């Protein structure tokens, strides 16, 4: 079975200013009353939609081996059109974390890495979504993690039972969430645990997933997530 992991970069939203208008009344020659003509009501300008991330921005947000602790090396990250499907619709955002394509997204750069001993894997992917899609995607993952403690995913035609749990980790970008996905493979007597950070900046999303060789390896995730998140946000902000 193949395990896929991806991450994403993002663009900064522009902050808009409030406009304010006031008019002052004059006084009469005889010292009459001063009239206040009133103020125009303050109205916040609509926040403009974030521009899509460019291919250059998405590429710039991808980690390189030199950005990681010693021993990590880059590996090829072949992309396909495979899309994992959850049997329960409310769990689909979690299944999408293990897909090569994200519905409604323009996919950008991606890179995978292996630890020095080849036992731990790290993968990052960046993509951009129109409108509020990026922020909505992060929220949908957070909601699904709370609603889908267990679910069944179909990947490569095979049903795979998955456990999901919210994962406290570093914050990144304008919004982010962490989730741990656990897949049991009885035939291989194997359990795969993947720690995932989903971060949003403007119209961009980063997926950073880490599969450690054992339970002790999970403690390295926060550092790896911060490295990936920092680079993605910097690239997204241009």
Which residues make up each language-model segment?
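Bacterial Sec-dependent N-terminal signal peptides
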Residues: 1-9
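N-terminal low-complexity, Pro/Thr-rich disordered segments
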Residues: 8-12, 18-60, 75, 85-97, ...
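Proline-anchored loop/turn motifs at beta-strand termini and strand-loop-strand connectors
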Residues: 63-71
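A small/polar (G/S/T-enriched), proline-flanked helix-loop surface module common
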Residues: 72-190, 218, 224-225, 236-237
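Short, well-ordered beta-strand elements
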Residues: 122-125, 203-212
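Short, solvent-exposed coil/turn segments at beta-strand boundaries
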Residues: 172-174, 199-205
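Mobile, glycine-rich extracellular loop/lid and propeptide segments
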Residues: 192-200
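A short acidic/glycine-rich loop-to-helix N-cap element
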Residues: 208-224
């Amino acid at each position: 079975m193949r395990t896929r992991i991806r991450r994403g970069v993002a663009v900064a939203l522009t902050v808009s200013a409030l406009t304010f208008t006031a008019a002052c009344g004059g006084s009469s020659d005889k010292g009459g009353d001063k009239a206040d003509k009133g103020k125009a009501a303050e109205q916040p300008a609509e926040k403009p939609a974030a521009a899509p991330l460019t291919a250059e921005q998405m590429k710039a947000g991808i980690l390189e081996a030199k950005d990681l602790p010693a021993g990590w090396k880059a590996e090829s990250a072949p992309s396909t059109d495979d899309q994992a499907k959850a049997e329960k619709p409310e769990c689909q955002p979690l299944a999408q974390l293990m897909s090569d394509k994200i519905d409604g997204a323009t996919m950008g750069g991606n890179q995978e890495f292996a630890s020095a001993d080849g036992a731990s894997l790290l993968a990052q992917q960046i993509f951009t979504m129109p409108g509020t899609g990026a922020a909505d995607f992060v929220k949908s993952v957070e909601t699904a993690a709370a609603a889908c403690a267990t679910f069944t995913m179909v990947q490569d035609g095979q049903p795979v039972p998955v456990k999901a749990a919210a994962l406290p980790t570093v914050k990144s970008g304008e919004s982010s969430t962490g989730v741990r996905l656990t897949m049991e493979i009885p035939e291989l007597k194997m359990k795969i645990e993947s720690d995932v950070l989903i971060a949003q900046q403007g119209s961009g999303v980063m997926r950073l997933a880490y599969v450690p060789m054992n339970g002790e390896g999970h403690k390295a995730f926060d550092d790896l997530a911060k490295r990936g998140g920092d680079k993605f946000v910097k690239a997204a902000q241009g």
